[in-house]
């Protein structure tokens, strides 16, 4: 009877370890998505800064989608349209758009840090469970 309880406990610990490892994998993938989004936002920010400084009168190709672009000329580089969520677009200056981007980057960095802390916490729990599991294993006979 005691052996059954020990086996069940071992299985419970193994299930808990698998659960934590699955969560860690998911959280790491979310950190990757956040990193890609931050990279994209930083690229947009740098592009806005460049266009504000040197964009007036420049001819550019405007992407339409599916690898198709159209030639256009920048008349007022300080007039941008920005998505504020739920498909709502508003006019903004480059400075306003860049400020919005910086706020989004900061929020994403805060979320990234929280996810990394959770990964660290879950990893610590897995290590504790592995130690507990190792202590429960019978000594190997030679």
Curated annotation (Swiss-Prot):
Name any one Pfam family assigned in the record.
Prefoldin
Q: Where does it sit, as one GO cellular component term?
A: cytoplasm
Q: Which UniProt keywords apply?
A: Chaperone, Cytoplasm
Function, as annotated = Molecular chaperone capable of stabilizing a range of proteins. Seems to fulfill an ATP-independent, HSP70-like function in archaeal de novo protein folding.
Source organism of this protein record: Thermococcus kodakarensis (strain ATCC BAA-918 / JCM 12380 / KOD1) (Pyrococcus kodakaraensis (strain KOD1))
Q: Which family does it belong to?
A: Belongs to the prefoldin subunit alpha family.
> Which HAMAP family would you find in this protein's record?
PfdA
Q: Subunit arrangement? A: Heterohexamer of two alpha and four beta subunits.
Q: Which NCBIfam families match?
A: prefoldin subunit alpha
Write the protein's name. Answer: Prefoldin subunit alpha 2
InterPro entries with a match to the protein in the record: PFD_alpha_archaea, Prefoldin, Prefoldin_subunit_alpha
Location in the cell: Cytoplasm
Recorded name of the encoding gene: pfdA2
Mind giving the lineage of the organism this protein is from? Archaea, Methanobacteriati, Methanobacteriota, Thermococci, Thermococcales
What are its GO biological-process terms?
protein folding
Looking at the keywords, is Signal present?
no
One of the record's GO molecular function terms = unfolded protein binding
